[in-house]
């Protein structure tokens, strides 16, 4: 198959999330787990970006002047806080409905975000480039992981960085992130995740390294039911995040 014919889009996944688009900003709705997850991933992104670019993470706008892409942005749960931290944000999603919800919410919140209903490959073909690329809870929903990671890596500027967050393909993840989360606790609608589409860390890292990026950090993330919060962890068996950087 030629590169131009390849696609990262799994239309069934786009349709699934489009059907839930109206609930993106409801903290008690179908995206409640992402609302719970947001504080730990926001802090992780802010701190790693500030460290890399020599910024003060406690300043009001530590991302000022940086161009940031949130690919698969959904309703904008990450885009808006990134914009508030000073970044020039492009939020991209294959779902027109998601983008519509994101635009409406940003307008009501007074936050400036450039939202586009566009694919990663279309952005890359247009020559777009960014200081920071976010792939957060997206890769397990795409059609071609290797092509997706390679495509996104090409949009990382020299000296820039990429964040990836996803779910590991392990029996532990199948038990906790799929069976328990979707069937027992009902945190997510059934069918949100499929075991065969979960992604192991090396399946993220290999195409990034092949595209000239260097792996800079890895961390697991776990949910503590006692504190009702997500925390960073050394255990990457279920949820995890990876940071990669492109040398100058």
Swiss-Prot record:
- InterPro entries per record: Methyltransf_11 (IPR013216), SAM-dependent_MTases_sf (IPR029063), UbiG_MeTrfase (IPR010233)
Q: Which family does it belong to?
A: Belongs to the methyltransferase superfamily. UbiG/COQ3 family.
Read off the Pfam families from this record.
Answer: Methyltransf_11
The record's annotation in HAMAP family points to: UbiG
The record's gene field reads: ubiG
- What is the official name of this protein in its record? Ubiquinone biosynthesis O-methyltransferase
List, in alphabetical order, the Gene Ontology terms for molecular function in this entry.
2-polyprenyl-6-hydroxyphenol methylase activity; 3-demethylubiquinol 3-O-methyltransferase activity; polyprenyldihydroxybenzoate methyltransferase activity
Task: Name the Gene3D superfamilies for this protein.
Answer: Vaccinia Virus protein VP39 (3.40.50.150)
What the protein does? O-methyltransferase that catalyzes the 2 O-methylation steps in the ubiquinone biosynthetic pathway.
Q: Where does S-adenosyl-L-methionine bind?
A: 41, 72, 93, 136
NCBIfam families reported in the protein's UniProt record = UbiG
> SUPFAM superfamilies from the xrefs?
S-adenosyl-L-methionine-dependent methyltransferases
Give its E.C. classification number: 2.1.1.222, 2.1.1.64
- Which reactions does this protein catalyse? a 3-demethylubiquinol + S-adenosyl-L-methionine = a ubiquinol + S-adenosyl-L-homocysteine + H(+); a 3-(all-trans-polyprenyl)benzene-1,2-diol + S-adenosyl-L-methionine = a 2-methoxy-6-(all-trans-polyprenyl)phenol + S-adenosyl-L-homocysteine + H(+)
Biological pathway: Cofactor biosynthesis; ubiquinone biosynthesis
A GO BP entry? methylation
């Amino acid at each position: 198959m030629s590169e131009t014919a390849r696609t990262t889009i799994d239309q069934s996944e786009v349709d699934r999330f489009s059907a839930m688009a109206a609930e993106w900003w409801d903290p008690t709705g179908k995206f409640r787990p992402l609302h719970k997850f947001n504080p730990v991933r926001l802090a992780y992104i802010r701190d790693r970006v500030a460290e890399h670019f020599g910024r003060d993470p406690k300043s009001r706008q530590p991302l000022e002047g940086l161009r940031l892409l949130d690919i698969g942005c959904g309703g904008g749960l990450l885009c808006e806080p990134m914009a508030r931290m000073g970044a020039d944000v492009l939020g991209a999603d294959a779902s027109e409905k998601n983008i519509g919800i994101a635009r409406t919410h940003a307008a009501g919140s007074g936050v400036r975000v450039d939202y586009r209903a566009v694919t990663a490959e279309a952005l890359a073909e247009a020559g777009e480039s960014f200081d920071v690329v976010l792939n957060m809870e997206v890769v397990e929903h795409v059609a071609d992981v290797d092509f997706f990671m390679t495509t996104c890596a090409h949009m990382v500027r020299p000296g820039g960085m990429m964040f990836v967050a996803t779910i590991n393909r392990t029996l532990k993840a199948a038990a906790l992130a799929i069976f328990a989360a979707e069937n027992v606790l009902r945190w997510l609608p059934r069918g949100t995740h499929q075991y065969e589409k979960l992604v192991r860390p090396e399946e993220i890292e290999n195409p990034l390294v092949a595209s000239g990026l260097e792996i800079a950090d890895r961390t697991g993330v776990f949910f503590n039911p006692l504190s009702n919060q997500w925390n960073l962890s050394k255990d990457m068996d279920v949820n995890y995040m990876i940071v990669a950087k492109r040398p100058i």
